[in-house]
């Protein structure tokens, strides 16, 4: 930087785990807040964001370093997103320098230009526009390609979706009928001027009331809970609410919990609205995410359908936020910056003065409480759409029953009946792999992870042992390392083992397994889901990713093989999570005109929770659970912050949290409880010893004040050099 230039102060948020900003010198004109700058930081060069123009600095001017480079002439983040991120950093007690990058695509964080890439387009030439298409009747693909391109230019990927391959395009290019040019795509947001919507399904009375309630308040903030049973037509309500907003040129953010729900949601929205719909999820590459982010920011995209991090995306004219499956735990970030996307979305809508719609068949108890206390509007859908009937529910007592790969003879017989009738069957087992552990039949040795207090999971695919906690992998041993016996057997059942059994028991009915192990590659999940809907597979095996929001009209039998573990968990949220999971899985049965049956296998059929769910449904369970939470002073009737700490030694982390507990208690906030420290459910993970300290109070403000004070105190403790700690505000998992 030229030393002869006049320099002034800029304050920069730096992506490091320090709860402060750093001042630098910059030439005039100063980069605006929201602009990226390249800065020297120790021996590194980092990309930070300007957050302020201070008039003075606590550091003597002579010691301040100049910026290396200003990367933007205009802010990449506007004042609305900057303010939202600053609020988030304060609420979740996390350094702003580490919070701000969550609002930026990876390429922008790295300092790449926040600009569109040029795309290649195929055009029909003058000769191509003039030629008689019948001259190409001997080359059907060339004829199809030219006919399409006469209507307008297309990208190679768009042509590929039309099953037009490059060979046909190259042949037409050689004939002088096509040419390829590079252009920057248009993102001027003119989609509203030629808005077109397809005809929707006819709404029933409840759906129409829900649509009217939201659209009548579309010009101001309002939080709405759409509490609709599975199959009640919540998506049709979303679409009907969006239509007048899109027609007015407003953009929409639609959030889904799982990557797997994105393609089907996009297809549904694209079929209804002839507007640009973009996606944002972790399955996309960095360039795709940047293009989607820019299209939203500049107004070129009408609808963004995204997972958790989409909540931070800037929009030119955002008109509504919709959170589908709002109860889902995937909306909570469980490491680093531990934000809850649903709660942040409500705050974003409030700050922007727009409505937010939270949809679920199994609303979280926090959201239900907000609806019942008047903070949210409560909209109910109690009838299944069309002619769909509510599925019959049965609990199978499997005490003393000989199971094969977790499957009882009774459930196997029911499967045979439904398959013979030409229907599909879905089995739910929330445990991937072949078996949860590997043991020696002779001496009892078990394959334990060396870095965690956990067993290795046996994966038959790849013949490996895999720790699902620290991700370490080792080959499947041929013999017992303790006694040398080759009698190594699995303990417990995973989805691989169930798949193996069913291909033997029902060889004439194709089986598909859907879990994280066989849907890692891009497009794999969409392919499987498409094949299921086309009837290629008759038996579906899946973990919870198959239970979320998918519509399988030919599934008439759903079996849940093993949910007993959740009945006796120490986590006070376990019952709520099980109730939601059961209800969501059960909702996959009988969603069209065919009647459905849900079968729950259990060693504890008399358990009050299972009886309540199968006889009275989720709503009754939620009423009971909220009464219990109120009596016990648990969320949503109190607020929590959870300190987690880990270190190489048990004593280090124990002493650190014990001192923190004493410090918190000495602050004398009489209504705030300090519970612990205690070991996590898994004391050792990835070679680190872990403990936690729970801080809880009936009012949010004093709890936040105490935690804010404690965090500032911790910054000066020498123990933090050996102990890694973090604070989780509103924790959803106490482990």
Stretches found by the model and what they are:
Residues 658-660:
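Long hydrophobic segments that form regular secondary structure
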Residues 52-54, 104, 182-184, 429-431, ...:
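A general secondary-structure junction signal
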Residues 512, 668-680, 721-729:
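Short beta-strand elements
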Residues 1-360, 372-388, 420, 666-667, ...:
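Accessory, non-ATPase domains that flank or precede helicase/AAA+ motor cores in DNA-metabolism machines
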Residues 688:
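Juxtacatalytic substrate-recognition/specificity segment
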Residues 198-204, 208-211, 220-654, 666, ...:
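Inter-lobe coupling/hinge segments of SF2-like helicase ATPases
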């Amino acid at each position: 930087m030229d030393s002869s230039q006049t320099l002034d102060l800029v304050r920069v948020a730096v992506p490091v785990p320090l709860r402060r900003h750093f001042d630098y010198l910059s030439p005039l004109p100063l980069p605006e807040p929201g602009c990226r700058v390249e800065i020297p930081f120790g021996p590194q060069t980092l990309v930070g964001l300007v957050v302020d123009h201070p008039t003075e600095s606590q550091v003597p001017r002579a010691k301040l370093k100049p910026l290396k480079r200003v990367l933007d002439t205009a802010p990449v983040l506007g004042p609305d997103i900057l303010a939202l991120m600053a609020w988030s950093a304060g609420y979740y007690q996390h350094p702003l320098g580490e919070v701000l990058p969550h609002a930026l695509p990876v390429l922008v964080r790295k300092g790449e230009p926040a600009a569109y890439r040029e795309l290649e387009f195929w055009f029909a030439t003058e000769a191509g526009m003039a030629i008689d298409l019948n001259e190409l009747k001997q080359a059907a693909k060339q004829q199809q390609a030219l006919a399409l391109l006469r209507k307008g230019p297309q990208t190679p990927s768009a042509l590929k979706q039309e099953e037009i391959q490059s060979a046909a395009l190259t042949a037409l290019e050689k004939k002088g009928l096509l040419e390829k040019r590079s252009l920057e795509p248009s993102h001027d947001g003119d989609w509203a001027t030629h808005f077109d919507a397809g005809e929707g399904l006819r709404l029933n009375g409840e759906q129409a009331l829900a649509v009217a309630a939201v659209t009548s308040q579309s010009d101001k903030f309002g939080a709405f809970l759409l509490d609709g049973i599975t199959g009640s037509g919540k998506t049709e309500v979303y679409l009907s609410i969006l239509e007048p907003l899109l027609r007015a040129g407003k953009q929409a953010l639609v959030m889904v919990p799982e990557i797997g729900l994105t393609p089907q949601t996009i297809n549904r929205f694209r079929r209804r609205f002839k507007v640009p719909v973009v996606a944002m999820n972790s399955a996309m590459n960095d360039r795709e995410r940047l293009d989607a982010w820019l299209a939203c920011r500049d107004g070129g995209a009408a609808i963004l359908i995204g997972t958790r991090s989409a909540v931070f995306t800037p929009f030119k004219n955002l008109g509504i936020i919709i959170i589908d499956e709002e109860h889902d735990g995937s909306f909570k970030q469980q490491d680093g910056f531990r934000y809850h996307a649903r709660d942040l979305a409500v705050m974003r809508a409030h700050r922007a003065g727009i409505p937010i719609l939270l949809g679920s068949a199994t609303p979280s108890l926090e959201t239900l409480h907000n609806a019942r206390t008047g903070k949210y509007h409560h909209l109910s859908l109690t009838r299944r759409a069309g002619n769909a009937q509510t599925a019959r529910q049965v609990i199978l007592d499997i005490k003393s029953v000989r199971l094969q790969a977790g499957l009882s003879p009774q459930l196997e017989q029911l499967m045979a009946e439904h398959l013979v009738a030409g229907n599909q069957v879905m089995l739910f087992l929330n445990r991937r792999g072949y078996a949860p552990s590997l043991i020696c039949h002779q001496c009892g040795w078990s394959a334990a992870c060396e870095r965690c207090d956990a067993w290795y999971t046996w994966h038959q695919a790849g013949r490996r042992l895999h720790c699902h906690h620290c991700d370490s992998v080792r080959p499947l041993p041929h013999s017992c390392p303790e006694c040398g016996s080759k009698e190594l057997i699995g303990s417990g059942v995973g989805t691989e083992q169930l798949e193996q059994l069913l291909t033997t028991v029902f060889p004439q009915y194709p089986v598909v397994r859907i879990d994280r192990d066989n849907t890692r590659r891009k497009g794999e999940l969409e392919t499987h889901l498409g094949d299921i809907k086309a009837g290629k597979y008759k038996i579906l095996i899946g973990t919870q990713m198959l239970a979320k929001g998918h519509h399988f009209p030919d599934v008439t039998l759903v079996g849940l093989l093993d949910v007993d573990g959740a009945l006796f968990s120490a986590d006070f949220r376990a019952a709520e999570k099980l109730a939601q999971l059961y209800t969501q899985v059960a909702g996959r049965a009988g969603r069209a005109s065919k009647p459905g049956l849900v079968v729950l296998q259990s060693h504890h059929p008399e358990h009050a929770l299972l009886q309540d769910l199968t006889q009275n449904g989720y709503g009754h369970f939620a009423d009971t659970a909220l009464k219990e939470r109120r009596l016990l002073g648990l969320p949503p009737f109190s607020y929590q912050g959870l300190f987690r700490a880990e270190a190489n030694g048990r004593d280090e982390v124990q002493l650190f949290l014990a001192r923190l507990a004493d410090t918190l208690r000495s602050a004398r906030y009489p209504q705030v409880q300090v519970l612990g420290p205690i070991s996590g459910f898994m004391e050792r993970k990835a070679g680190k010893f872990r403990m936690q300290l729970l801080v809880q109070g009936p009012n949010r403000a004093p709890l936040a004040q105490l935690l804010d004070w404690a965090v500032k105190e911790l910054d000066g403790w020498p123990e933090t050099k050996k102990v890694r700690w973090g604070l989780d505000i509103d924790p959803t998992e106490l482990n």
